[in-house]
Amino acid sequence: MANVVVVGAQWGDEGKGKIVDWLSERADVIARFQGGHNAGHTLVIDGEVYKLHALPSGVVRGGKLSVIGNGVVLDPWHLVKEIATIRDQGVEITPETLMIAENTPLILPFHGELDRARENQNSVAKIGTTGRGIGPAYEDKVGRRVIRVADLADAATLELRVDRALVHHNALRSGLGLDPIDRDALLVSLREIAPQILPFAAPVWKVLNEKRKAGKRILFEGAQGALLDIDFGTYPFVTSSNVIAGQAATGVGIGPGAIDYVLGIVKAYTTRVGEGPFPTELDDADGERLGTRGHEFGTTTGRKRRCGWFDAALLRQTCATSGINGIALTKLDVLDGFETLKICVGYDLDGTRLDYLPTAADQQARCTPIYEEMPGWSESTEGARSWADLPANAIKYVRRVEELIDCPVAMVSTSPEREDTILVTDPFAD
């Protein structure tokens, strides 16, 4: 049985939630392998809108096992609230349908405070974080002072972990002008939340390996996008974890040989939230039109997204670093009505043509896009479910994208509704 990794191939917000939900019917297990609740998924199922941040997209599908892997950083208080919200919408969530890796790091209140304090004081070069503590939690994980889910089960261990973390954080807070952390209040909060988290705790690595040996199909769900990867993204304007497909293995505790297909999710244009380079960004009427038609506001923050033309040069990079086998092209319908469309095929850097975005931030800032123009289409593609439903110029656009990124289109999405999807290649096909 094939196991599939789904990754965002741009700067996030590509429509992964819909595609993961669409694929989840073919999967037995849906496992999230990185990120925190700073990334949001919006699912529309039978007219019901579900907004997920920490929970895997598979929770809204009955009879599936959803997993939060060790590569995720988890805010336990947020998770409890999100579970309650989704339950109120009629979704059953139990330890039989949701498992959390015992070695998953926890985001604590002081992580968010530190995140916001740094961002507020860094007036010269803001990163554009959501202020939810994701980065500081990952720092603690690497610094070997993070509190993990399993630590909630033993009072003595929990106290030791808290004391170790506070030695570091109180010194750091002093330099930022923040009050020391109230140790006793923190311990009380953790002891109160523990009974609501521990029933979901499990040795996820063991469960997933057993599922794989039993021939179950596993869908690995990433958050954000490959251009926000801590190593291969537009550093330092990136997230604090690896986002590329290779993280799926380490983020849940399964070998890389378990990955059979990597599906990259790609908008038919480009968007970005927050700071950082964006070569094809549009500050004109076309950019406004893309944002309005595409409803480009963040699920988590409500922040307006920056919009621009499709960047094939960047997509070639992410296809390489994630080993993408095929892409799901989303929001094709947003391009309806444009007389002319542009695709970035490379960059001009001080008179030299490049077919990739350089690593150095100063060079990224000096890159100007080299465009190829294509005719648009006046017909509507919204709701199309087969190639026959698409205008000729829309098909030409999709085919040109394939040629430029050297990767086939496996799926095309033409509306937020899950059924409005053109399937070219089933990623789960054996």
UniProtKB/Swiss-Prot annotation:
Cofactor binding description: Binds 1 Mg(2+) ion per subunit.
Compartments where located: Cytoplasm
GO cellular component terms, semicolon-separated: cytoplasm
GO biological process, any: IMP metabolic process
CDD domains linked to this entry: AdSS (cd03108)
Residues the record lists as binding GTP: 12-18, 40-42, 305, 331-333, 413-415
Binding residues for IMP: 13-16, 38-41, 130, 144, 224, 239, 303
Residues that hold substrate according to the record: 299-305
Active site positions: 13, 41
Enzyme kind, highest EC tier: ligase
Cofactor requirements of the protein: Mg(2+)
Reactions accelerated catalytically: IMP + L-aspartate + GTP = N(6)-(1,2-dicarboxyethyl)-AMP + GDP + phosphate + 2 H(+)
One Gene Ontology molecular-function label: adenylosuccinate synthase activity
Involved pathway(s): Purine metabolism; AMP biosynthesis via de novo pathway; AMP from IMP: step 1/2
EC number, UniProt record: 6.3.4.4
Keywords in alphabetical order: Cytoplasm, GTP-binding, Ligase, Magnesium, Metal-binding, Nucleotide-binding, Purine biosynthesis
Binding site for Mg(2+): 13, 40
The keyword Transmembrane helix is assigned to this record: no
PROSITE patterns in UniProt: ADENYLOSUCCIN_SYN_1, ADENYLOSUCCIN_SYN_2
InterPro entries: Adenylosuccin_syn_GTP-bd, Adenylosuccin_syn_Lys_AS, Adenylosuccinate_synth_dom1, Adenylosuccinate_synth_dom2, Adenylosuccinate_synth_dom3, Adenylosuccinate_synthetase, P-loop_NTPase
UniProt-listed SUPFAM superfamilies: P-loop containing nucleoside triphosphate hydrolases
Family: Belongs to the adenylosuccinate synthetase family.
Purpose: Plays an important role in the de novo pathway of purine nucleotide biosynthesis. Catalyzes the first committed step in the biosynthesis of AMP from IMP.
Assembly, per entry: Homodimer.
Name of the protein described by the UniProt record: Adenylosuccinate synthetase
Organism of derivation: Ruegeria pomeroyi (strain ATCC 700808 / DSM 15171 / DSS-3) (Silicibacter pomeroyi)
UniProt gene name: purA
